Amino acid sequence: MCASFQTTEEFAALQLQGMRAAAQPTSGDEETAPGVAQTRQWFEAEPLWFKRAVFYEIHIRGFFDSNGDGYGDFRGLSEKLDYLQWLGIDCIWLLPFYESPLRDGGYDIADFYKVHHDYGTVEDVRQLIDAAHARRIRVIADLVMNHTSSDHPWFQESRSSPDNPKRDWYVWSDTYDRYQDARIIFVDTEASNWTWDPVAGQYYWHRFFSHQPDLNYDNPEVQQAMLDVLRFWLDLGLDGFRLDAVPYLYEREGTICENLPETHAFLKRVRKEIEENYPDRVLLAEANQWPADVVEYFGEDGDECQMCFHFPVMPRMFMALRREQATPIYEILDHTPPIPEHCQWGLFLRNHDELTLEMVTDEERDYMYSEYAKDPRMKLNLGIRRRLAPLLDNGRDEIELMTAILFSLPGSPVLYYGDEIAMGDNVFLGDRDGVRTPMQWSPDRNGGFSRADFAQLYAPPLMDPVYGFQAVNVEAELRTPTSLLRWMHRFIQLRKEHPVFGFGTYEPIPTSNPRIFALIRRFEDDLVLCVHNLARSAQAVELDLAAFRGRVPVELFGNSRFPAIGELPYLLTLARRGFYWFALEAPENENSNA
């Protein structure tokens, strides 16, 4: 079997010895190591794995450089799998790694079948997947279905001649006045969704950057080509895809060209392919829309994507924290429709993009800018390009509280690489690069990310006194029992011990204090009460728990038993930015009767 670590101290000792991989298997281990087929059997036995999973998003370029060229790569990621196994994550989400001119961080794909040379080879990807699977870690990857790079051979052929067989693979027009109701997404950089191409002698359609022409999904050949891409990577062992920019696949006059019926019809076709040939794989939709629109991407009875990101809940968590009011969280959850039982929301605090403010009012957006983006360089498009720790002023209590709320909500949490050690950002780097700096492994050269000369690095590591790699790194936090990293490890393990967080229902709990966010998670006979204090000061609260009278709250972290719930409101006092998670145990006589 693969090496595993019984304690944090064992892993820390190995890491501090400078070992790139935590342990090498002995000959006996090799004989008993699970094969690819056996691992896949394990995975297929748990088709709803994504409902209880903790995801971890990785920018390959910024994670670990194995060959000293200044760029993170697949072999480097493979060397760090034992760290991820120890941390407790269940699934790695990879940002785009395909061949690309990298004008948009890899979301401008020039070849769906090739790996960017900085990252390695297709064989390196296969080896990573096999090594992750051996540790019971799944791997999903971004797939950009909506568009390609303008450097893609498909587009080069399409623009070359009106008679080219691939001319109709993209959306061309003699004028730029079609689809006028469609909004411009990148308002900072694009003035139109149409761009003139002098070679083609026509305008081409793009919902994002002008160097990212949209594919024409009205062409059956395009649909088949994208299905072929999916099959290629799934056959390699990938466990699924995060479908980027999925609402924009089709265009129709008189609409905003988003969430169209034709898009859902194609997604049903994709899901049918998955169900018939890859039954344990997952599709995660990126649809930055209101929940009432996003639920359509689960499909009728869950026949489209198994998971969808819940974007609007994220800015409201930050809003609730600064306002010290739970109302924004309650309201967005109240406006979230039910989803099919075998589907799941994807939830996150931060990711590789800006903290999007598209799904808030103008007044709320101005408030968020005034609180979290006081420097104009922190703004990007309709969002804030900052990491979690700087957003929260590096407050340990705030980071723990926001993580606790995230983990308590109905959905599967997604962590962004480096947030487990409170990495900072660099607002002086352009575009979104400020939140994609190198992972900080140690206080050594380049933060332990790379042996390359500083000038060779794809981006400079952080070196300021608060967030720089000499102050914030994995090695230092492994040494410290009270570090955020060690806390995060324990917290992930705690959540995984309670299936109610992955499979349970959500019930808001009435409170006497608007600064308290309280909820019940219920799954079969398990009940967990989560109470969070959003205030900067200690708060007392009375909870209406009469429906659970007789049950005994047992605090999950310390296993402390609190007084049994009675008819009267239940009184708690929480520290500033504090929280409690309780298992509500049935009375002993009820258990004995059972």
Residue ranges and their predicted role:
Residues 1-594:
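Active-site and adjacent substrate-binding regions of carbohydrate-active enzymes
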